[in-house]
Amino acid sequence: ISCSLVGSEMCIRDRYMPVYENERGTYIFNSKDLNMIEYIDQILDAGIDSLKIEGRMKTALYVATVARTYRKAIDDCKESVEKYRANMDYYKEEIAKCTYRQFTTGFYFGKTDETSQIYDSNTYIKNCTYIGIVQGHNDKGYVLLEQKNKFSVGETIEVMIPDGTNKEVIVKAIEDEDGRPMESAPHPKQMIYVDFGEEIKEGYLLRRRELR
């Protein structure tokens, strides 16, 4: 265990650190997720001109949501700090649509303390579900969708548009690849055709907001 993470200045090989366990196990290195969306102006002022979005073990929805939001925040801030600050609620709402474990600023403003870790749970917060990615269209104008999670006819789905905007559409009909109607799409990675009543471009990601 790194001593800097538990309050000591240097590591000593024969020094033991107490580890506590409950009926669900331990929560060693159970860090909150890094979130610097509220400090883009300070990052740019510091001369940083490249940010890395961590994508390992993440879904395409997570990477698309985070990368798109930071890209828009950076562009807005470079246009004017006032515009960036005025859109802060939008950035924070978008980041919160990812699956996450509370937020921290990590080591950006100095050493972390006990508030950067989670000690009583390993539960993720989930506000949106990844529905699928548009792969094409058929002759009827239905969207060919690689489905990721179950959804049903009549549900409202949110389309992520690369410019940072979102659009809500309603599932009017679902068909399998052979044209047979379906009331819901329960099988992950199934290729299906969906009628949203309007065109959705290939490559766009779809998600559903979860009620709280």
Task: Show where each model-derived region lies.
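Anionic-ligand-binding alpha/beta catalytic cores of soluble enzymes and soluble regulatory domains
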Residues: 54-129
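Single conserved hydrophobic/aromatic residue that forms the stacking wall/gate
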Residues: 1-7, 11-12
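Generic recognition of flexible, low-complexity loop/linker segments
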Residues: 39-40, 58, 120-121, 132-133, ...
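Beta-strand/loop-dominated core regions that host nucleotide or nucleotide-derived cofactor-binding catalytic loops
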Residues: 129-212
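Long hydrophobic segments that form regular secondary structure
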Residues: 24-70
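Gly-rich Lys/Arg/Thr-decorated short loops/hinges at beta-loop-alpha junctions or inter-strand turns
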Residues: 16-24
